[in-house]
Amino acid sequence: MSKRDFYEVLGVDRSADEREIKKAYRKLAMKYHPDRNSDDPDAEEKFKEASMAYEVLSDKEKRSAYDRMGHAAFENGMGGGGFGGAGAGNFQDIFGDIFGNFGDIFGQSRGGGGRQRRGSDLRYVIELSLEEAVRGCKKEISFTAPAPCETCDGKGAKNASDIQTCSTCGGHGQVRMQQGFFAVQQTCPNCGGSGQEIKNPCNDCHGTGVKDKSRTLEVSIPAGVDDGDRVRLAGEGEAGGAGVQNGDLYVEVRVKEHPVFKRQGADLYMDVPVSITDAALGKEVEIPTLDGKVKIKVAEGTQSGKLLRVRGKGVTPVRTTMKGDLICRIMVETPVNLTREQKDLLRQFQDTLDGDSKHHQSPKKKSFFEKLGDLFD
């Protein structure tokens, strides 16, 4: 049994109330539950340690004894008198009090007196264009995963009469391991949590009830999904085997880069190139949107980097009704590959600007040199 202070194990003060103790245990149970940490051999021990601490500190009588005597309170008569009756209680009841009916948060479902395993969840990454993600679509996906054996219909046995209640766990799927004063439940080593024994296994799947199979599914992608969103297909994951629930399939969305638009939440962004003359004189410019072409007004004297908002031309994110906007960034283009005549005309035009500085025809330039003057005065 763990010799660490139980309050330290749960990370609570000695004055913590019942609510604080339950909250601390829930956090640790979520973090270290063996079903979520199959690749971490230390997680199960930490989970047991937290469970032991909670079993004592959540019970007023046990907590009082622990506060007076520490671990010594439970080192004598652990299996019989004293606190023996309470200590022999079902650990599953403790866990159920904390998590209610949310056993499948650990990839398992609760059934009968114990908790049965379920097949593993699967992940499939699907690439969509921006248009497909915004409007929604249907996609076919193909993958190979464990599926119910067709020979035995997923039962794992040649005949239904060959399936019997597990003699080790009595059909509960779990066995209780006594650790001194505490009782901790673990998956039954005989039936693997299914609660059943197969006396005459199927020759094709060797009693597992599953075989790898290539599958093709049609997935409905809802309108408005974004990069990283997931679509859950319940029961379409890995087959759990004989008497065990299937896992789920999670289709993860990857939105391909668009040549024109970039998405940020509900809004779309795009760069709109305009010539120097159009920016200086103003012009109505036609731009693309996901709903078709629209015109925007580039006002006279518009500077490069100016943002113009087109209302309602963005995206309606999934599970919302509010549509975003299209944000247009004006990019004033400097002409290149000018002829000699064009260069001369531009110099003449520049001379007219230099001679009429009182009208501030280059506001950014004026502001820049004013700041320089303030800096070096």
UniProtKB/Swiss-Prot annotation:
Residues 353-377 are annotated as: Disordered. A zinc finger (CR-type) spans 136-214. Residues 367-377 have a biased composition (Basic and acidic residues). Zn(2+) 1 binds at residues 149, 152, 202, 205. CXXCXGXG motif repeats lie at residues 149-156, 166-173, 188-195, 202-209. It is found in: Cytoplasm. SMART domains: DnaJ. Gene3D superfamilies: DnaJ domain, Heat shock protein DnaJ, cysteine-rich domain, Urease metallochaperone UreE, N-terminal domain. One of its GO terms (cellular component) is cytoplasm. InterPro entries: DnaJ, DnaJ_C, DnaJ_domain, DnaJ_domain_CS, HSP40/DnaJ_pept-bd, HSP_DnaJ_Cys-rich_dom, HSP_DnaJ_Cys-rich_dom_sf, J_dom_sf. This is Chaperone protein DnaJ. It comes from Psychrobacter sp. (strain PRwf-1).
